[in-house]
């Protein structure tokens, strides 16, 4: 897949998510940011799982990386958990979020394989 198609896909996804966003919920991470956080978490989770360490060590490494991810998006773990719970109890929204996450991870994996 060409770089132009990937950029177009990401732009289109971002545009759709922003236009559908409902900002009435206070303290809930917007869908587009939640998608980005989940994508980052899944990418790092996969990378960390391939490290040659014990399971407990891998969990600790992921927990540190998770904190860095939250910090990079200026959210706390509490806000993330509250937001995830909100989306969990709104299955259509969560399905939409994860569809974009899955599509984005598929594109990421395809581009990673082409390197």
Locate each region found by the language model.
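C-terminal motif of bacterial Sec signal peptides marking the signal peptidase cleavage site
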Residues: 16-19
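Bacterial signal peptide processing site
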Residues: 21-24
């Amino acid at each position: 897949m060409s770089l132009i198609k990937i950029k177009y896909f990401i732009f289109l996804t971002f545009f759709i998510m922003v236009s559908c966003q409902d900002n009435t919920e206070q303290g809930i991470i917007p869908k587009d940011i939640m998608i980005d956080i989940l994508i980052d978490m899944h990418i790092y989770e996969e990378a960390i799982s391939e490290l040659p360490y014990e399971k407990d060590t891998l969990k600790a490494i992921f927990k540190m990386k998770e904190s860095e991810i939250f910090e990079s998006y200026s959210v706390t773990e509490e806000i993330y958990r509250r937001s995830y719970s909100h989306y969990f109890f709104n299955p259509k929204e969560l399905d939409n979020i994860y569809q974009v996450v899955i599509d984005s991870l598929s594109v990421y994996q395809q581009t990673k394989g082409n390197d």
